[in-house]
A protein has these predicted regions:
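Domain-level signal for soluble alpha/beta catalytic cores
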Residues: 1-310
Length: 310
């Protein structure tokens, strides 16, 4: 597995998929609830397979399990904790089916997300409870995935706990940080991104990424990380702001940025490549069309010369 990743990185850059959740919103026409993505995973697994396939077709080398919302804490909040194992299995089966149907060597990433919900660094379970919960998720996923993605980590504590648990799998671990909407030098917790990078890399992560942040602050964050991180990446979102979600709203209150179309997103992605990113993809509001444009950067004959001249 290590050789495969090395070959992929040496050839150019690795392409992740885009935002599964917002694609489900657009296609499922399902009633939006705090656990809407889990509802779709349970009720319409065929749609999850379809979206995975579309991202693979667009050029994704890695797809991520669609179990982001299926943490024990989030499920228990709505008295649905008994669905945990079933939802994890639905997500695993959907990803495997999509890879099988496409017949390509696409890798599957397990996901260790924020346990109470995204963008809420002040809502902590405590170190011991967090470790236990991440271990439960890991136990469901590790036999079925090629790597682990600890994503949308909003604080150093959250990032380090998830990374340390993921390292127990023996698989590659990539950790993705989400940054302040106005200053990409800081996590949403207010902690400096360099301190976060140092702490996460000390836990053993083999790549450090910035995710579910605006493209502009993602660029800022990569500027900070570049001198300190050997393998870094980015997958930004297309939201105007995520502040409503900090108040436990549903995603229908979030507004997308119409200017973040596939072409403009690819322009940001090219800038990230020039800063040294080796892993690129998309988060919320970034669909297969955006990923296809990122793939076109890899197909650009001038790409290697651009990097050499930078």
């Amino acid at each position: 597995m290590a050789t495969l990743f090395t070959n992929m990185l040496n050839s150019s850059f690795i392409i992740l998929d885009g935002g599964m959740g917002q694609e489900l919103v657009k296609r499922a026409k399902h009633k939006l609830t705090p656990l809407w993505s889990a509802d779709v995973l349970r009720d319409h697994p065929d749609l999850v397979v379809e979206i995975h396939r579309d991202f693979i077709q667009a050029g994704a080398d890695v797809i991520t399990l669609s179990s982001y919302a299926a943490t024990p804490t989030r499920l228990a909040k709505y008295n649905r904790q008994d669905e945990f194992e079933a939802l994890q299995k639905f997500a695993i089966n959907a990803a495997k089916q999509a890879c099988h149907e496409m017949g390509l060597s696409t890798l599957i990433a397990g996901t260790l997300p924020p346990l109470p919900g995204s963008y809420r660094p002040s809502e902590r379970l405590g170190s011991h409870l967090s470790q236990q919960e991440y271990q439960r998720i890991l136990d469901q996923q590790y036999k079925h995935v090629d790597l682990f993605l600890c994503e949308t980590m909003a604080s150093i504590e959250e990032a380090c706990i998830s990374t340390s648990v993921a390292m127990k799998s023996g698989l590659p671990v990539w950790t993705a940080l989400t940054v302040n909407e106005k200053n990409g030098s800081f996590l949403r917790s207010g902690e400096h991104i360099i301190k976060a990078a140092q702490a996460v890399l000390a836990e053993g992560a083999s790549a450090l990424l910035v995710n579910c942040s605006t493209p502009e602050t993602t660029t800022q964050a990569l500027n900070e990380l570049a001198p300190h991180v050997k393998t870094m990446g980015a997958y930004a979102n297309g939201f105007l702001t995520v502040e409503p979600l900090q108040g436990h709203a549903t995603v229908d209150l979030l507004k997308s940025r119409q200017e973040i179309n596939p072409n403009t997103y690819a322009e940001f992605a090219q800038e990230w490549l020039l800063k040294g990113a080796k892993i690129l993809g998309g988060c919320c509001e970034i669909g297969p069309e955006h990923i296809e444009k990122i793939r076109s950067l890899r197909q650009n004959d001038d790409y290697e010369e651009i990097i050499k001249d930078y």
